[in-house]
Amino acid sequence: IRCFITPDITSKDCPNGHVCYTKTWCDAFCSIRGKRVDLGCAATCPTVKTGVDIQCCSTDNCNPFPTRKRP
């Protein structure tokens, strides 16, 4: 499977059986810059924690960098 990986946001091969993920969360600059984003691949979908959104998928390049909605 191929997944987008941060910080370069490039598509890279991940080991067999892995899933792609997109993890987003707010930090001190969230209202100005938007949510922080981490893209990658993992053996299993990362555990969800309070304040962190995680989406996992299992097709090539299914985790593109999310677009920020403009007001």
Curated annotation (Swiss-Prot):
Disulfide bond recorded as keyword: yes
UniProt site positions, description: Binds to both neuronal alpha-7/CHRNA7 and Torpedo AChRs: 25, 27, 29, 33, 65
SUPFAM superfamilies, per the entry: Snake toxin-like
SS bond partners: 3-20, 14-41, 26-30, 45-56, 57-62
A Gene Ontology term for the protein's cellular component: extracellular region
Variant or mutagenesis effect after changing residue 36 to A: 16-fold decrease in affinity for Torpedo AChRs
Outcome of swapping residue 28 to G: 5-fold decrease in affinity for neuronal alpha-7/CHRNA7 AChR
Record-annotated site: Binds to Torpedo AChR: 23, 49
Impact reported for residue 65 to A: 7-fold decrease in affinity for Torpedo AChRs and 15-fold decrease in affinity for neuronal alpha-7/CHRNA7 AChR
Tissue/organ expression: Expressed by the venom gland.
Keywords linked to the UniProt accession: Acetylcholine receptor inhibiting toxin, Disulfide bond, Ion channel impairing toxin, Neurotoxin, Postsynaptic neurotoxin, Secreted, Toxin
Pfam families named in the record: Toxin_cobra-type
Membership in a protein family: Belongs to the three-finger toxin family. Long-chain subfamily. Type II alpha-neurotoxin sub-subfamily.
Subunit structure: Monomer, homo- or heterodimer with cytotoxins 1 (P60305), 2 (AC P01445), and 3 (AC P01446); disulfide-linked.
Descriptive protein name: Alpha-cobratoxin
